[in-house]
Amino acid sequence: MQPRRIVLLGSTGSIGTQAIDVVDGAPHLFEVVALSAGGGNLELLARQAVHTKAKAVGTASGDATALQRLIDDAARATGVAGYRPEIITGPDASTRIAEIEADVVLNGITGSIGLAPTLAALKSGATLALANKESLIVGGALVKAAAREGQIVPVDSEHSAIAQCLRSGTAAEVDRLILTASGGPFRGRTREELHNVSPEEALAHPTWDMGLMVTTNSASLVNKGLEVIEAHLLFDIPLDRIDVVVHPQSVVHSMVQFVDGSIIAQASPPDMRLPIALGLGWPDRVPKAATPCDWTQATSWTFEPLDAEAFPAVNLAKDAAKQGSTYPAVFNAANEEAVMAFHAGRIRFTDIVDTIEAVLSEHPGSSGLTVESVLDAEAWARARTHERLAVSSL
């Protein structure tokens, strides 16, 4: 059997680097044929290209000559002579890389800029291993319409867990989806105690090692709100049948409750290589993708309800999803701008979600959902967020 041909989008990020680890561990199963990254770490991208011998490499920023020079340097350092991949540069590099013939496209890009590559991957006919939740959230019905049944395989640990649990019953037997949340670094704090937390504190996630945006979103629970929308879209479960429970140990990644009262949970130590491997190999599991739980050691798992007063982002995300159309895109764009303002020291931590709520309340909506209407709504939300924050800082 030939290895599956893999395209990695966002290869230098957390998901991308771990995906290469997965491929390295199962070279008989997977082969990387193309890579792309934003361009913030061209040296790493060059090393990855040489390591995987990808046929094509893309970068949103940086020129082809500079990248080829770095690839040549990396090739000499590792004794790989004459390696000359196709190099694609420019803002649409990841979209063009996603169009390359492959069996699986892993979209590990962060943010709504992943929408065009997601649509391109679906159009190509490849299976889409989706870690870029924002593209599904802002694209909504557009993305679902572009995908054939089963073409999108979730890579987020929570949604991968749900997909695994759903194998235990039919669609008609599903009662509720239960997403788990670690609670982030501020679990147990009141809203008043959250006012003056620092960016450094927000980035100190107790479980996962992620980038600035995702880590901050985990601290505010905006990330969990986005995941609720994602679960709603992926699994066609109404929003009022999707719950969030806090589970600090991050071992149970999500659960499915069935109509007979049974609950099926997926549990494993927190390691993104497991859902990445499953996304690449779906529906088959990859042997030894991650280390299992050690049942020779005493352990305890705890669960507690979400404090929606201290962390209103989940309910706010549900409201945006219920309004539909371009409201989820506005939610996401306003959050991204507010997070950057927080890290620039311009607003307080609690202002992030307050700003999202204010911008959502002013959004005029859209008569239909198209790529253009999504982009217009995002641009409006970013501009309106900047305007509000500029006024508040005066």
Curated annotation (Swiss-Prot):
One of its GO terms (molecular function) is manganese ion binding. Pathway: Isoprenoid biosynthesis; isopentenyl diphosphate biosynthesis via DXP pathway; isopentenyl diphosphate from 1-deoxy-D-xylulose 5-phosphate: step 1/6. Keywords: Isoprene biosynthesis, Manganese, Metal-binding, NADP, Oxidoreductase. GO terms for biological process: isopentenyl diphosphate biosynthetic process, methylerythritol 4-phosphate pathway involved in terpenoid biosynthetic process. Its EC number is 1.1.1.267. Its cofactor is Mg(2+); Mn(2+). NADPH binds at T12, G13, S14, I15, G38, N41, N132, E134, G211. Mn(2+) binds at D156, E158, E227. 1-deoxy-D-xylulose 5-phosphate binds at K133, S157, E158, S182, H205, S218, N223, K224, E227. The keyword NADP applies. InterPro entries: DXP_reductoisomerase (IPR003821), DXP_reductoisomerase_C (IPR013644), DXP_reductoisomerase_N (IPR013512), DXPR_C (IPR026877), DXPR_C_sf (IPR036169), NAD(P)-bd_dom_sf (IPR036291). It catalyses: 2-C-methyl-D-erythritol 4-phosphate + NADP(+) = 1-deoxy-D-xylulose 5-phosphate + NADPH + H(+). HAMAP family: DXP_reductoisom. Belongs to the DXR family. Catalyzes the NADPH-dependent rearrangement and reduction of 1-deoxy-D-xylulose-5-phosphate (DXP) to 2-C-methyl-D-erythritol 4-phosphate (MEP). PANTHER family: 1-DEOXY-D-XYLULOSE 5-PHOSPHATE REDUCTOISOMERASE, 1-DEOXY-D-XYLULOSE 5-PHOSPHATE REDUCTOISOMERASE, CHLOROPLASTIC. This is 1-deoxy-D-xylulose 5-phosphate reductoisomerase. The gene is dxr.
